[in-house]
Amino acid sequence: MKNKLREDMPSVKDIRIFRSRIIRWFNKNSRNYPWRETCDPFKVLIAEMMLRRTKADQVKQVYERLFTEYPDVEAMANAEDKKLEQVLYPLGLRWRTPAFGSVAREVRERYQCKIPETREELTTLSGVGEYVAGAVLSIAYNKKEWIVDSNIVRLFRRYFGIKTSKEGRRDKHVIEVAKIYASVRNPRKANLAILDFTALICIPGKPDCEKCPLRRNCHYVCSQS
């Protein structure tokens, strides 16, 4: 791998320093959610599907009830859509509800109730895109798999000064940086760290630069001074 990705892109060394500072911050500031207390790939998959366009605190209210009633793939595969809809109702976005039963049935029929361990297989499942697949692989299986959402794109743009395409989540340069970021001994921790950092520090609108451990080398901060 080349040390430099592109003229306006960070070096591998820069990305590693960035990662180590975020993980150090995470060690003292991590958020606690029930789906982070398990490495059960089924629970991680369903939690990540619930978290799409939904705040974590809303998902927290539903998570325990959902897995009390449907603790595994087989139970959710056999669930009636109307009953699933009742449990998931507080999340809103009712159009997502059918995907939960569908994904459980697909896993049962195609993978004998075992959640796939590759991005290629995961992304063939109902309701599973690149982000959810990467989250499952890194968080449940601790694989060196990348995740990119709009928050991570924002952080990369601000800190590194990366120029991206309009659809930043699919930008090949952003994905390349995310791949290097996740290439670490504990990708689960690294990816959870960047998610919390973008939720608590490098937030939309006005970031909390005063509390940011990255501010000294941040392209955004330097441009404001």
Feature locations, PLM:
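RNA-binding accessory domains that recognize and position tRNA/RNA substrates
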Residues: 2-3
